[in-house]
Amino acid sequence: MIRKSKKITKQRGSRTCGYGEAKKHRGAGHRGGRGNAGHQKHKWLSVCKFNPEYFGKYGFNRNPCLIKKLETINVGELEEYVLKYKDAFKLKDGKVVVNATEIGFEKILGKGRISTAMVVKAVEFSEGAKEKIEAAGGEFVEL
């Protein structure tokens, strides 16, 4: 059986019950406010020392109108797509003709393997994609 009296019971009659001066037990006023309160006022030195980049603006954001966002697909994924929907594509000289813009892609990237000879038409191609398409016996056409 534990016979330990509570802290408050021990401190009865001591006027401040372990909180030091009476003013110190009056809410957040003793701490200068709750949380980040006062960071631009009386706690400014701690901001300068520990988190100087907290206030102010740094760098810049490009205008979204100037950012060219192209829908991309990798060569390996394109071949899988072509093999899955063979009937939808035309043949020309034994090669599958793929117009990437018609299926919703503007740029062809070079990740993956390709073994099907294809004529790929797109707005842009990466260098790796060009090499892989030609190595498989196909050709690329930039629109």
UniProtKB/Swiss-Prot annotation:
Coiled coil: none
Keywords associated with the record: Ribonucleoprotein, Ribosomal protein, RNA-binding, rRNA-binding
SUPFAM superfamilies, sorted: Ribosomal proteins L15p and L18e
Pfam families the record matches: Ribosomal_L27A (PF00828)
Annotated GO CC locations: cytosolic large ribosomal subunit
Signal peptide: none
Gene Ontology biological-process entries: translation
Biased composition regions of type Basic residues, renumbered to the chain: 1-13, 23-38
Cysteines engaged in disulfide bonds, as pairs: none
Residue numbers spanned by region Disordered: 1-38
Superkingdom of origin: Archaea
GO MF annotation, one: rRNA binding
Description of how the protein assembles with itself and partners: Part of the 50S ribosomal subunit.
Family, per entry: Belongs to the universal ribosomal protein uL15 family.
Function: Binds to the 23S rRNA.
Protein name: Large ribosomal subunit protein uL15
Source species: Methanococcus vannielii (strain ATCC 35089 / DSM 1224 / JCM 13029 / OCM 148 / SB)
Organism ancestry: Archaea, Methanobacteriati, Methanobacteriota, Methanomada group, Methanococci
